[in-house]
Amino acid sequence: MALQETIEQTVTGLGYELVEIERTGGGLLRVTIDMPYVSGAEQFINAEDCEKVTRQLQFVLEVEGADYSRLEVSSPGIDRPLRNEKDFERFAGELVDITLKAPIGVAASAGSAVSANRKKFRGTLERAAPKDGVAGWQIVWSDEPPVKPGQKVSKKKLPAPLQALGFTLDEIHQARLAPVVDFKGRKPKIVPGADKSSEK
């Protein structure tokens, strides 16, 4: 059995989701795990989860005779990679960084302030209308710089218009959650249509 399959079966068998497997120089085998997605529940990987998976993988990889010198099991962190449709569904509405396989081109940038050579974007991930029967996504952003603490903003100044770029998963080279650090605490994710009477 291939190493990828062995690791995936072991991780999912323990009740976790395999996010990424990486082999680096020096024989390091890095395995990234996460909690399976459950709508409405926000769960996080902790040290005990990583330890549990590490112990099981060490046993399984020894039995399989896998060639590695060090094993590292960790959570995906604040810049979690988005790899498949399920990941995009899970993190819709979140701030993401995407890199396209090819620049958007002159046709796509016509009539907008976006450069035709641009491949990298940061914005809010949203579901879009399907294109040719393929599930569509879009990223929405504003090129207005963020307001700095203590900075005064004129009430007369018009905000920069929102821009959107539609894409399919086949056009993505890399997508990750944007690492946003807020030391004032985690803000609850606003769900459209949620019952506002329960908020007090």
From Swiss-Prot:
One of its GO terms (cellular component) is cytosol. It is found in: Cytoplasm. The keyword DNA repair does not apply. InterPro entries: Ribosome_maturation_RimP (IPR003728), RimP_C (IPR028998), RimP_C_sf (IPR036847), RimP_N (IPR028989), RimP_N_sf (IPR035956). It comes from Polaromonas sp. (strain JS666 / ATCC BAA-500). Keywords: Cytoplasm, Ribosome biogenesis. Belongs to the RimP family. One of its GO terms (biological process) is translation. Required for maturation of 30S ribosomal subunits. Gene3D superfamilies: RimP-like superfamily, N-terminal. This is Ribosome maturation factor RimP. Pfam families: RimP_N. Its main location: cytoplasm. SUPFAM superfamilies: YhbC-like, C-terminal domain, YhbC-like, N-terminal domain.
